[in-house]
């Protein structure tokens, strides 16, 4: 129940929540003033708006509507007010200088904006001035920009100039916020400049430049003086939150100190207060900052002070609450207006933009009228209310939307009828809405419900005004049943709802009270029955069953409704009868009485005029008596004394007014009431009033041209109509004529007449006449007199005077006398008594006055605006006269823009043109040493030109130059003389002896000699080599490269050229001045290269089952890169199991080839490439083709077994070569002795591989064979088997054994179908190391009923030999299945073989292929500091790749992963390599500055060296020394750069930054500009200022602090590293102990003698291959990457007598990111994916060409030491082994990057004599190596068991490593580079391992270097090859077999080569020999190890083959650390191998 109630309430809230939301708003109510230029106009958007769209209107502040004035004012449809540009004569103050406001109105109400002051500003001519100032050295100077007061409000200072250069506020120059210029610490040179201010008009945008003012600086030492105020303030008024600057600056000597006081007290400590040289600055002003401020300046000779007042104005803010209100009629509304800000304000209230008038309903309360109260609100009170607060010029407002609606309650949610059990609580909910919120009451059967414990009510009001009431009945009884009614009431009305609630129990009827009904209304009578159930409720009246007429309705719940009750008809007894049983009823009666309500007859008020008698009766025509009649006016009781008399009778009441007046207007209501009801009737009384004058017209004066209002205001009802008439003339009016209303003359809303522009013709009488049809019309006349204000009628706008001559200015005025004429010059009134140069004469001329101003004589200062002002009592007018005084011009300011070798560029600025147009310029120049009599000149230069070039000068010469300017008045004085020096010239001769030599397919070497000495014109700085391709189709444009000069002969190599293309080359020399002529073009052709694109249109067509035709077309000629030699077709087969066949290739010169001998019905991949003399080109995309079908080969195997006495079962294997799709199998059965001529034939489906043949004869032999059938026909038959049926059927397996290969994570089925009688039992076992383990059935393994073993989601550990044994009473049978699980390939070994500026060449060696051919490689690379990797997909045959288009000088990260049919394998270690190049550097030998004058500097940036990478940008920053701010200049050119607008005679700091892709280089220097006269300035002197001590302290303290931090950081780092070393040592010991425990495990064949020691693998960087020098070994303790492990430390952890311990070999320069101490990342999981989970991901290992080395030191004292390059192979039992995980060599990089020890890998890694000699010298320093012998050998073991190893030669070895002839005698060379593209055996040498398809003879064809008597007994020709488990090999056999390439170099200090000690007999057959053995020579006396016993020739089929001695070379499953200690008894898995390189020290 409660849950239901909650959902009802929630739905109610959602359904009735109404958003009152304000639909009116202000876009911007802060607009309160708009000033605009008369020449521009203005557009003012309406600040108010509404949603939905509101009607926008504009009004004047007086409330008058505004109207459109064509071309003057217009209101757009969107509410925008536009004032158009206008001339001064069209100015109208009503339009252009008035207050406006805008309103927005929609259904929500109407709001108005604050008043907006709109003011137009005229474009007045004005001048700004700066006066000359005086100051002492070291003091302060203040310049002020003097702006005329008439425009001061609109004009502001925007900048200052010093000698036409804008002043940047810094150092000694400061610009105040109000436009003053302060110069502190005045220097002598400050007097050499002129200072100007620049102003800007805020509204017109017009700028003005002042005159140039000068500063006079006293030459003498400063004189002692008291302080004098230079700038101060008096009062400021600023808004809060802004910044203010109070100026206070004074001069004096000594410099005065400044102290500030506020209200007589020192300034408080506040960060907002800042004392500056310009004064006191206060930020974020607050009201409390207001006060009186005193600035005191004091020195030793006196003091001065200035006092000013600061007033902070807090802006007014108004908040009106509530913002929106929706309530009901009759409620009370309270609006509160809260203000913040200034306390002085006035509040006004508006409703819908009208001022609120206080009446009976509305009152305004509060001290400041801040509260508006509305009582008994009516519908008319709805609307928008605004609270306006005004203080002086500030106005703020806020508004609220009030919505009043009919508040009569209504039920919005209720309950329904229900039946409840006694004691079962229930709750009833009733929700009502109204305004004000109603109150809900409850009744049961028309009686109030008592409040007790059983009945509880709960009522609350929701946020939307809904009242919710609950009636909760906790334990209902029968009496609680009945009709429940909820009634909602408020002051407006009521509403109710009822429904029956039945409580189960015996029915009964409550006593019913008599009912009084109102006639004409509906009445409900409830039958107050309680209890439930009952059958029916019926009503009777006068024994008649109701209803008996249409006005009666009986509802199902027993309620009787009487509609339109009638007296008499509906009165009487009503009986309610309730049928409670079929024959039993109960009843109760009720009496109904009908009362008739009053009925008022209609009445109306007749039209009434003031003073009339009025009588209105109110008659009640019907209704039960008694009836009470009353009257009300406007809802209030009519009081006595109001002039209204009321007379009442029994059924009538009359209202009588003896004399009607205006106060009687209103709504009158007659109310009649009796016992039945109260009724009323309302009518309105309107009193008509004749017109009367409120304001009578009176005679008045109008001013010509101004607006005039003729006042006339009338009142009356209906509102009177006013008409204005006019009678011209000043005499008695004869006749009045109606005045036509125009745009100039209009009638205002108050009836007054508005004349917008009063004219003289408006003189006359005006009549105001009003009428409204009541009484007689009224009228009143008045006389208008027009007064003429003073007006200027004539004056010249502009005039010209000549300097030194007299000039007269005339001005004529008219208007009402007297007229006064005043002359002003600028803003100053001219007084001839004080200034004798001026004279004023005035005379009358009729109705005009003429005034003349005479200047005697005119000078330059008179070039201003003169104004004559005419003034009388009615106005003032002004005439502006611009006087221009002309004179000869000032000399121009000349500057040298650019000086070249043979020319110079001049620029000049004309300072003052003499107020006459400049007509030309003259330039004169001469040699510095000559007099001006020998000058050269250029005359009459056009005045429109401000710069010129002087040519034909001599390089490196000194010239003097000056200028004149002239106008029509005369010629100026000469300008200041400048001195310049010309520069060097570019070379005039080309380089000599240019030759070209092609170097590669993309490079040409260019050689040449310098130009002749006499043509160099300076020092040759470098050369530009231009080259272009001369082949057809090239654009013929030269590409330019640049290099520095190195001597008389030069060499340069052009790279990145097109291959096999002809190029033309030219060379040019350049010096500082430029580039000389180029040499003659010489041509050369680049060398050939391989084709860069494959052949096109490659097609393949299958001709027969073993023949296919491949065709193609020639690649594009442009991609051949040479002479095409032929084509090579590469193809390989794709087997059904997903593996690839052997790759083959065919070479041809034709464009078609026929491939024969292909496998039948086989998919082939085909690629075609073209080759040139340079090698093979790019292969084409792989093309797939399938050969056609042929007849199949014989089935691969056949079995036949007896299944009963008369039947046999034959099974077979599919053909090894099906040559097509097998359609069926045919089984042949023949009996040789039966005499049947033909065998019987049986056919089966292709998916059935066995068949039962029945009905055979017992004891008779039968011969069986099988043939497969394809679409090509029947194939070859299988081997024939003989069988005879037998009664006893022993267990036989008809399935076949063999090898099953599958990818991991797949389900595999191993079949073992058997026959026999009885049915055989099946048992599966799996071979382990020492026994066969039964296969258990679990979730992973399942044995089906037919004997099939199902392995689900196979893993690598599921690989192995599975044996199925079938057994019954008569025998058993066994098959063996070898399961090989393919896994993703192992990680490749990635190395860097070569780098260049834009490329990195990578090489790699693939890892274990996981049992599946490698399909390709994925190479990823990224920039070192980026994690965005790019992918490159590479063919599986590639072993190297060149990354091109890389950034120069950039580190790159590279990683590689291989992919096979299973998926992608482990990612290689991330290696890093850097392309060639470095950041730019600046050569100290280069001259940076080529020219410096007083304002410019020219820089030569050719001194920047690119570092091998092109420079992308050069940034120059410079500043005057001592300044903080830098000016910057950016360029991409390395040529010349100009620094302009420098200060003269100033030292500058310059810093440069040049950047390329490798980084940025920096360079800094200083330079000084020249003085204004061209002289140099002295060096910088160290002058200690205020901040010097702080700077020195900072300079000293910083290094100390940094050093202290560095020491502390070093201490922490060393402590951390020490902890890491200890942890690594513990890890090393733990690993050693673990290896000991593994080593102590027992095997099948225990090793005799001491076990081999564990090998500790420690990750350190790759360094030199041989031995560290003594100094390096001593530094092991300082290694920061790997802890040194000593013999003593290892002896504590392990038994020194039982195995060897590991010692790390270090290099002092180590990188720190080479991995942890024990790095297991190189442990190859082989085919075991589980083991990979414990190995770190390759992504976590990042090596900068680092390698892992392990030094295993045996405790046994032997002189032999072996350095092996692969720690995964078995090490020697005697000696120290250093292992290397990478297969390439490296040396320390020459790169100097910090933190990077990168290694440069070469394509071939070999040791030279020099390296061995150095190692020999190092060995002599070590006591342990005094008698050392160096042996260097190499050994290779294939990592594949492919068919390539069956050839018996090394030619087909895996191409990842190739053996080559040593480059030097005695040194075995190792090459890690991939095969070259043109290698003829490339197809054979590609490392694509083929899955093993072994037969017995596979191991007979192993290469010589794999065979060994120790493992295999040589088979005789008649003896089969011994069966050996696959993937087993002997280290000894490898060493023995691979002896031909082995070489030795013996370096013995004693010249006595010791041999190897002979092994003991006890260990000769069990101890593994050294990994590499030297060739038997005279120098080697060590005997060969004794051979091990031979293996048995033919082990039994059901036993495991073992060997006496063998070693695991490269396990694919077990740990490699385990492998090194495995000893004998471990079976080597197929395909394992090792690649290694070793160096042996004996």
Swiss-Prot record:
It is found in: Cell membrane; Synapse. Disulfide bonds join 46-102, 145-197, 248-295, 337-387, 430-486, 527-576, 618-670, 712-768, 811-868, 1312-1364. Glycans are attached at residues 28, 78, 369, 472, 514, 557, 667, 711, 750, 797, 810, 927, 1083, 1145, 1163, 1276, 1346, 1493, 1532, 1562. InterPro entries: DSCAM/DSCAML_C, FN3_dom, FN3_sf, Ig-like_dom, Ig-like_dom_sf, Ig-like_fold, Ig_I-set, Ig_sub. The chain crosses the membrane at residues 1593-1613. Residues 1781-1790, 1841-1863 have a biased composition (Polar residues). Residues 18-1592 are extracellular. Residues 1716-1742, 1781-1805, 1841-1865, 1940-2042 are annotated as: Disordered. It is a single-pass type I membrane protein. Gene3D superfamilies: Immunoglobulins. One of its GO terms (biological process) is retina layer formation. Residues 37-107, 114-216, 227-311, 315-403, 409-502, 507-587, 597-686, 691-785, 789-886, 1279-1368 form the Ig-like C2-type domain. GO terms for cellular component: plasma membrane; synapse. Residues 1961-1983, 1996-2005, 2023-2034 have a biased composition (Low complexity). Keywords: Cell adhesion, Cell membrane, Disulfide bond, Glycoprotein, Immunoglobulin domain, Membrane, Neurogenesis, Repeat, Signal, Synapse, Transmembrane, Transmembrane helix. Residues 1614-2042 are cytoplasmic. Cell adhesion molecule that plays a role in neuronal self-avoidance. Promotes repulsion between specific neuronal processes of either the same cell or the same subtype of cells. Adhesion molecule that promotes lamina-specific synaptic connections in the retina: expressed in specific subsets of interneurons and retinal ganglion cells (RGCs) and promotes synaptic connectivity via homophilic interactions. Homodimer; mediates homophilic interactions to promote cell adhesion. This is Cell adhesion molecule DSCAML1. It comes from Gallus gallus.
